[in-house]
């Protein structure tokens, strides 16, 4: 099961517009990837043990590195570029140039493949949000 949306953002989906920067990487101007990486971290921090933008690996306009520890205690170094996110190492701040892993368009898709506990946390957050919307609708 791929989860390509953040349950915390469901209430803002009505503001979704064609061509918006929120639609992903295609068709947008070059971004500062460090800022993009910070946004990625803030989106999914609730569903992992630890996640932060690397301070020791070079960030630039076109690339940033994110360290993540899943709830299963597996550590990864992720590369964020205009192409998306991919695993580049199996430890914090580690880049293995020989590692061949696929790019994922979203952090949700990437974590969905790496962490069953992420899927569970995402599903629980989604359920809580839907229950809150239901309660608000009944008031």
From Swiss-Prot:
It holds the Pfam family GSKIP_dom. The keyword Cell division does not apply. The keyword Nuclease does not apply. Keywords: Cytoplasm, Nucleus. Changing residue 42 to I: Abolishes interaction with PRKAR2A. Prevents the Wnt-induced transcription. Does not alter the phosphorylation of CTNNB1 in the presence of Wnt. The record marks 130 as: Required for GSK3B interaction. It is found in: Cytoplasm; Nucleus. Residues 115-139 are annotated as: Interaction with GSK3B and acts as a GSK3B inhibitor. PANTHER family: GSK3B-INTERACTING PROTEIN. Forms a complex composed of PRKAR2A or PRKAR2B, GSK3B and GSKIP through GSKIP interaction; facilitates PKA-induced phosphorylation of GSK3B leading to GSK3B inactivation; recruits DNM1L through GSK3B for PKA-mediated phosphorylation of DNM1L; promotes beta-catenin degradation through GSK3B-induced phosphorylation of beta-catenin; stabilizes beta-catenin and enhances Wnt-induced signaling through PKA-induced phosphorylation of beta-catenin. Interacts with GSK3B; induces GSK3B-mediated phosphorylation of GSKIP and inhibits GSK3B kinase activity. This is GSK3B-interacting protein.
């Amino acid at each position: 099961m791929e989860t390509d949306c953040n349950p915390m953002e469901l209430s803002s989906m009505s503001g979704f517009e064609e061509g918006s920067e929120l639609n992903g990487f295609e068709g947008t101007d070059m971004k500062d990837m460090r800022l993009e990486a910070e946004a990625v971290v803030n989106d999914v921090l609730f569903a992992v043990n630890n996640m932060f933008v690397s301070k020791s690996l070079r960030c630039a306009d076109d690339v940033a590195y994110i360290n993540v520890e899943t709830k299963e205690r597996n550590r990864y170094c992720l590369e964020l570029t205009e192409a998306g996110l991919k695993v580049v190492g199996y430890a914090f701040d580690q880049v293995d140039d020989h590692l061949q892993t696929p790019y994922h368009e979203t952090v949700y898709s990437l974590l969905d493949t790496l962490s069953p506990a992420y899927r569970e946390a995402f599903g629980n957050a989604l359920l809580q949000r839907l229950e809150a919307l239901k309660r608000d609708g009944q008031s």
